[in-house]
Amino acid sequence: EYTAKGNLVGVISNGSAVLGLGDIGAQASRPVMEGKGVLFKRFADIDVFDVELDLEDPDELVTAVRAMEPTFGGINLEDIRAPECFEVEDRLREAMDVPVFHDDQHGTAIISGAALLNAVDVAGKSVDDLHVVFSGAGASAIATARFYTSLGVPKGNIVLCDSSGVIGTDREGLNEYKAQFASETDADTLAEAMAGADVFVGLSVGGIVSQEMVASMAANPIVFAMANPDPEIGYEDAKAARDDTVIMATGRSDYPNQVNNVLGFPFIFRGALDVRATEINEEMKRAAAEALADL
């Protein structure tokens, strides 16, 4: 009430997983973090300090961020690689009395979740019957898969694929986060997994989905090809792959139906700061997705 803390968010990164650039380090990540601050201010009038930490050890990251709690009304974690990002966020949420939100995870989950809620209506499908295939098994994919289950998608109907193919229960050496979504399936490849699927969620690399793969999906498929700067399949190619309705979205602004985190994170933090929330919980995330879907 008496200081700027109530309208101040820390955008904190170690630059280990910058979108489209990878592990470029703390210093090189600064333009991205400054840009994030501009979006916070432009859309939600939230002040931001960007903090780039030259730290890779999760223990050191947690200690450094916790020490900044007196300064910030909320913490936006950004571009921290998986699987360390899960541990870092979980520990900070437990330890801190201000909202801690890893946007690469939850921003993507919320915005694509809102898109999913509307897409099922257009496609004449039901959330609780969907079969969903993910290309990608990093922070955003795992968080989005978790969020889809909270929206009603059966966990057993979700298949995750990484660079080695389908993540099955027979795969050895999985980290605990990928193991949560290991599937009982005969499919080995992304192409095999997509056959008959209702939804494709791309959070991986460009150009890995063919028209034949889209053609193999269930009737009126939903295709969220969100890799940037190049989607897993182009908008025109996906639409031309079938004669029925293809609900197609990408992460790009030059195609229709852009799925972009900027639709969420400024306003989610605005609401959390205004009510002096101590966390951004699952109910708040679902409410944000449902509100976006209703726009």
Language-model features, listed with the residues they occupy:
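N-terminal ligand-binding/catalytic initiation module
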Residues: 1-99
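Solvent-exposed alpha-helices and their adjacent loops that cap or buttress functional pockets
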Residues: 2-5, 41-42, 67-69, 93-94, ...
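General beta-strand structural signal in soluble alpha/beta enzymes
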Residues: 13, 50, 76-79, 100-103, ...
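Glycine-rich phosphate/diphosphate-binding loop of Rossmann-like nucleotide-binding domains
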Residues: 19, 24-44, 96, 102, ...
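Predominant activation on well-ordered alpha-helical scaffold segments within soluble catalytic domains
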Residues: 34-41, 62, 66, 86-93, ...
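Adenosine-phosphate binding glycine-rich loop
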Residues: 103-104, 123, 129, 225-295
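Rossmann-like adenosine-cofactor binding region
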Residues: 179-247, 252-254
